[in-house]
Amino acid sequence: MTNRILPLAVLVATLAGGAHAQSYTLTPLSSFGGDGWLAPGEGGISYLGTANNERGFAYNPTSNNLLLVSRTGGLSIKVLDGMTGADEGALNQGTGVITGGTFTGSTIGVAGDGAIYMANLAGPVGGASAFKVYRWANEAAASPTVAYSSTSITAGRLGDSLDVFGSGSGTLLVAGESNTGSGGSGPRNGYAVLSTANGLDYSGTLVTFTGTPPNAGDHRLGLTFIDSNSVMGTVGGNWRLSDFSGAAGTLVDSSPTSSASERAMDYATIGGIGYLATLDTASSLVRIYDMSDPNNPSLVTSGNATSGTLSANGNGTGQVQFGTISGNSATIYAMSSNQGIQAMTFTVVPEPEEYAMMAAGGLIAFGVWRRFRR
C-alpha cells in the first residue's frame, strides 16, 4: 500500500506547487515617445541631450508625471507626462533659493504625498560647497524651500544618488556617499539618511560601517530603500544590502550584479512580492529581480526599448523608477545619462487557471482513491 500512496502524493504536491508558478513580461509603453523611448533630442527637445547634463529623474505618484533635472542651458526641472513623455512645463525655482554646489541640481525624488526633493551635487562637502536638498510642496509650488543644508555631514561627496521613502513627517531621504580627490580621509562607504519631524525641515545622519565591504563609494551610483531601515546600493559589480540604526550600518548581503555596469535601481512591491528594477548604464538594459529572498535576487526578465548606437555614459549615472502599480502590473521608467528615457510595462503573469484546477483535481482523485482502496 505504501508504494501506491507515494506516486499520488508526489503528483498532488507537484501540481499544487505548479499552481504558484508565474511568468513575466517587460514591454515598451508605446504611448511614451511613440515607441517606449524618448531619445536624446527627439522632436527637437533640448533638455534631454548627450552632454552628461541629465543625471536624475523621478516619478510623481500624485500626478503620474516625471520630473527631470536638466542642466542643459542652465538648471531646469522639467515636468513630463508619464504616459506620453510630452513636455508639461517646469517647476518654479523661485529667486535666489537654489544656489551652490558642484552642480546646483543633480538627483531628485518624490514622496508618497507628492512633495518633491532635489539634491545638489557637492564634492567634496565642505565650507565651499554645502550639500543641499530642496523641497517643493507639489508641482505647482511657487518656490522651493531649503529642506536640508550641511557643510559637515561628510568630507566626501554627496548627490550622485538619492531615494525617498514614505510621506509627511515620516519621509526619509538617503544619499550615497563617496570619496573625492580632496575629500579628506575616511572609508566613505556609507550613506546620509535625512529625517524630519514636520515634513518640511530635515536633519541628517551619516551611516557608516565598520570594516569593508562596503567599499568607498559603494552606494554612489545606485541606491534604493527596501524598507524604512534597509537600503541597497551599488557602484557596479556588487550590490550592498544593509540595515541601519542611527549612525550604525550593518552589511547584510553582497550579491554580484549581472554586469559591472548595472547601477541605478529601484524597489517596489507588486502583488505582494518585492521586485528590484535595475539599469545597465552602458547598454540601457533594464533588468527585473524577484526579491522574495533579498540575499539572493532572482532575475525574472529584462528589456530594452532603445535602438541604434547609443552615446556613451562614461560617468555611469542615471536613474530607474517604478511608476504606476496596478494589480500585477507596473510601469517602469529608466534613464541612462545621454541615452534618453525609456518607459516599459512590467507584468507578473500568474499560472493559467487550468493548472490550479488540475491541482485541485489531483487532490480529489487522491481522496477518492483513499476512500475505495482495498
Model-flagged regions — what are they?
Residues 72-76, 122-127, 178-185, 238-239, ...:
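Short glycine/acidic-enriched loop and turn motifs that connect beta-strands
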Residues 81, 85-113:
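Blade-loop segments of beta-propeller domains
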Residues 254-303:
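Loop/turn-rich, solvent-exposed surfaces of beta-rich toroidal or solenoidal domains
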Residues 23-43, 87-96, 142-154, 200-212, ...:
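Beta-propeller fold detector
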